[in-house]
């Protein structure tokens, strides 16, 4: 959702989390060259067998993280947020419940780690199940978290692109 507010002569556009299917990714290319490049990387590469780890895609601009994980229960849900990067999360196998909250609703649990571009927060979240072929885009105005999906008893393969804010 895009919200536009007018303040006299200043226009402020706030973009919030996006969830969609990968076949619709080109709709979001206009949001930035880095997002378009990350989506093109998904489209042009087989990511099903690549080893878990961190891969530079474009030096200092786009990094790809590959995760294979078995879901675990959590008693305490914490949210994460970033200041310098947009997260594109793409599901290849398994499903997760992803929590979202606007940054304004957070309580920082520890000092923000500038070096890792990571803040650990508590916030009331809304949850959506994401499945293979789906992606979520989280902007610096968004908090997000992944929790166990009780309906899915399988491992999850997820690709996360860290796209430097342009």
Annotated model-derived regions:
Residues 87-90, 127-128, 135-136:
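His/acidic/aromatic-lined binding-pocket segments of jelly-roll/cupin-type domains
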Residues 84-96, 104, 111-116, 162-163:
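Short, conserved beta-strand element in jelly-roll/cupin
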Residues 6-65, 73-81:
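A short, N-terminal "cap"/entry segment at the start of jelly-roll beta-barrel domains
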Residues 64-82, 92, 96-106:
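Conserved short histidine dyad/triad with adjacent acidic residue
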Residues 130-147:
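Conserved metal-binding segment of the jelly-roll/cupin
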Residues 148-152:
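Short proline/glycine-enriched turn/loop segments at secondary-structure junctions
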Residues 84, 120-125:
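Short alpha-helix capping/helix-loop boundary micro-motifs
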Residues 135-137, 153-166:
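A short hydrophobic beta-strand segment most commonly corresponding to one strand
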